[in-house]
Amino acid sequence: MSRRGTAEEKTAKSDPIYRNRLVNMLVNRILKHGKKSLAYQIIYRAVKKIQQKTETNPLSVLRQAIRGVTPDIAVKARRVGGSTHQVPIEIGSTQGKALAIRWLLGASRKRPGRNMAFKLSSELVDAAKGSGDAIRKKEETHKMAEANRAFAHFR
């Protein structure tokens, strides 16, 4: 057994303009090739576009979108006796938010449009309204978990 001390849990930092942890999580997921300033530009442009489209607080739209896409349950492949079962498992809040952000960014990357800021803002507004690809992905995951409910005891 290791004699080292346990590592302290890191708290999520918040972004410089909005002082919001969700925005920072979004920036870190959109980041490519270490270009963080570009990631910040994309996010802030998307937030401005949301402000123009909805004429409400863009951070509340972001929170609502992430809350709408966050899954409560997911399936995990588990090998039992030579066959692989999709076992439904509950998801914690942090992991759920991370999944929601990943799905939102994936859906916005697939969208047709001019640039990433435009696509991301459109996806966030749609998700806040309860439509869009990311919401569909969440519903699909929940259906999969419900269909494989019989394997819940394999946890």
Swiss-Prot record:
Subunit (UniProt): Part of the 30S ribosomal subunit.
Record keywords: Chloroplast, Plastid, Ribonucleoprotein, Ribosomal protein, RNA-binding, rRNA-binding
Protein name (database record): Small ribosomal subunit protein uS7c
Protein localization: Plastid, Chloroplast
Classification via InterPro entries: Ribosomal_uS7, Ribosomal_uS7_bac/org-type, Ribosomal_uS7_CS, Ribosomal_uS7_dom, Ribosomal_uS7_dom_sf
UniProt function note: One of the primary rRNA binding proteins, it binds directly to 16S rRNA where it nucleates assembly of the head domain of the 30S subunit.
GO biological process: translation
GO MF assignments: rRNA binding; structural constituent of ribosome
Location, primary (coarse class): plastid
Transmembrane segments: none
